[in-house]
A protein has these predicted regions:
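Conserved ABC transporter NBD signature motif
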Residues: 63-71, 78-79
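Conserved ABC ATPase "signature" region
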Residues: 103, 107-130
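Conserved ABC ATPase signature
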Residues: 134-138
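Conserved catalytic motifs of ABC-family nucleotide-binding domains
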Residues: 155
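Catalytic Walker B motif of ABC-type/P-loop ATPase nucleotide-binding domains
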Residues: 159-162
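ABC transporter nucleotide-binding domain
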Residues: 177-267
Length: 317
């Protein structure tokens, strides 16, 4: 990846808290300009710590981070001015109006007043009609929209969203997905952490998986699905079986509890999938089937498998 394509570069990043807890372990990560990167990981995996270090909220124990070439330690103000952060918590002054909140946020970054930009921003977030209302009067979903408006008030190039749709209803979640895609189309680089696998599957260009402070992988979503996703051939039988036919007993075939379905798991990228051999073996055994279809592993299954393998490796280390 060339320097012009990389907007955030993380090298050897580590964080050990005073308690001795190691939140991050030598993380290396390059974030591409204009992409949506989703960071997946269970609670306590290190997602929020990673974001907090990049945004200058938490000091790293080791390693280096640059934002558009600016070191987050030596050039803190320049690096931070390029970043907008939407935290998990609803952190707003409840007695301020929506307009006062976003105006103050813009001023804190030393940006001159720009009423036209802020009006456009609030309209895009369906907040313009609420601009004179106090924060305490807004619903939880609207308060979260205000957090996004605050983060974008100083016109950053990069937006971090830490669990952006936690606690919001499905309709609002999909509205926010659409808004995030619009921001990406305008050139904003977006990094989000999420517990919702569907959210990452819906929006991300690339996906990173983090577990126990280690970045397990970062890959294009389509490539990840293709490389790690298993395919299954699902064979609906004409007559139930009591056991697997001898000819397929050594293959990756399972018989469902009701005996009515055979499930064959295979690597779709392999030179030989074995599907043809399986079907011929069943025909020789006189097994008749009424339907055959296939399915691809979901991102959720891939994620669960990666985290499970990581935990097993740590347990045996």
């Amino acid at each position: 990846m060339s320097a012009s394509e990389t907007v955030i570069a993380v090298s050897g990043l580590g964080k050990v808290y005073q308690s001795g807890f190691q939140a991050l372990k030598s993380v290396d990560l390059q974030i591409r300009r204009g992409e949506i990167l989703a960071l997946l990981g269970p609670n306590g995996a290190g997602k929020t710590t990673l974001i907090s270090i990049i945004c200058g909220i938490v000091n790293p124990s080791s390693g280096k981070v640059t934002v558009d070439g600016y070191d987050i330690t030596r050039d803190y103000r320049r690096a931070r001015s390029l970043i907008g952060l939407v935290p998990q918590e609803l952190t707003n002054n409840l007695f301020d109006t929506v307009w006062a909140t976003v105006t103050l946020s813009r001023g804190l970054f030393g940006k001159p007043p720009n009423r036209a930009y802020l009006e456009s921003l609030l309209r895009d977030l369906s907040l313009w009609d609420k601009r004179n209302e106090k924060m305490m009067a807004l619903s939880g979903g609207m308060k979260r929209r205000v957090l996004i408006a605050k983060a974008l008030a100083h016109e950053p190039q990069i937006l971090f969203l830490d669990e952006p749709t936690a606690g919001v209803d499905v309709e609002l979640r999909r509205d926010m997905w659409a808004m995030v895609r619009t921001l990406r189309d305008k050139g904003v680089t977006i990094i989000l952490t999420t517990h919702y696998i569907e959210e990452a599957e819906e929006m991300a260009d690339r996906i990173g998986v983090i577990n126990r402070g280690e970045l397990l992988l970062v890959e294009d979503k389509a490539v990840l699905m293709r490389q790690l996703g298993k395919r299954q051939l699902i064979i609906q039988l004409q007559q139930p079986l009591t056991s697997l036919p001898a000819a397929v007993a050594g293959k990756a075939v399972e018989l469902t509890d009701d005996g009515c379905t055979l499930v064959y798991t295979f690597d779709a990228q392999g030179e030989q999938t074995g599907v043809g051999d399986l079907l011929r073996s069943l025909a020789r055994e006189g097994v008749e089937f009424k339907d055959v279809n296939s399915s691809q592993s979901s991102l959720e299954e891939i994620f669960v498998g990666l985290v499970h393998d990581s935990n097993q490796q740590r347990g045996t280390a």
